[in-house]
């Protein structure tokens, strides 16, 4: 089992946050 460093956790959280923002923006434009 590989140990996950704090840096990888931060990168994963930031990338997930960006994906959520892009998806919400795309959803708003599609619904309008």
UniProtKB/Swiss-Prot annotation:
Q: What is its main location?
A: plastid
Mind listing the UniProt keywords for this protein, alphabetically?
Chloroplast, Membrane, Photosynthesis, Photosystem I, Plastid, Thylakoid, Transmembrane, Transmembrane helix
Listed disulfide bonds for this chain?
Answer: none
The annotated topology with respect to the bilayer is: Single-pass membrane protein
The subcellular localization recorded is: Plastid, Chloroplast thylakoid membrane
Q: Name one GO cellular component term.
A: photosystem I
Provide the transmembrane region boundaries: 3-23
The cross-references to InterPro entries, in alphabetical order and at most eight, read: PSI_PsaM (IPR010010), PSI_PsaM_sf (IPR037279)
> GO annotations under biological process?
photosynthesis
At the top level of its lineage, which domain of life is listed?
Eukaryota
HAMAP family, per database record: PSI_PsaM
Identify the NCBIfam families for this entry.
Answer: PS_I_psaM
Family, similarity comment: Belongs to the PsaM family.
Q: What is this protein called?
A: Photosystem I reaction center subunit XII
- The species this protein was found in: Anthoceros angustus
